[in-house]
Regions:
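Asp-box/BNR beta-propeller blade signature and adjacent active/binding-site loops
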Residues: 1-110
Length: 110
């Protein structure tokens, strides 16, 4: 059941021209302390690359401004597609990785 709606202006919460500045597949939620959070796969070169890390951005002002990205999970595999569920004062973060075999399949694309 949707209890609360948050309105924001359309726009970017992060913009980087850096080589590893690609952030994608976001999920947004409200933390028990009231802050907004967006989790995603970030610090990537592009959609398909082996360097993704699960990252989070935080906002204390209803989405007007956002923190720099914080790394929540990083492994030697590509950390992808973070999901978020906040319920009953608890936070569940989901993510997955791809195997080295799958990464080898796409070698040379990055």
């Amino acid at each position: 059941m949707l209890r609360e709606m948050c309105r924001m202006e359309f726009g970017k919460i992060w913009d980087s021209q850096e080589l590893f500045g690609y952030f994608a597949w976001p999920t947004a939620g409200r933390l028990p302390d009231g802050r907004l959070i967006v989790v995603c796969s970030g610090f990537r070169m592009r959609h398909v690359c082996p360097f993704g890390k699960v990252t989070a951005f935080y906002s204390d002002d209803e989405g007007k401004t956002w923190s720099s990205p914080a790394v929540l999970s990083s492994s030697i595999l590509d950390n992808r597609d973070a999901g978020l569920c906040v319920s009953g004062g608890k936070v569940l973060l989901t993510t997955f990785t791809v195997s080295r075999a799958v990464q080898r399949k796409y070698m040379g694309m990055w």
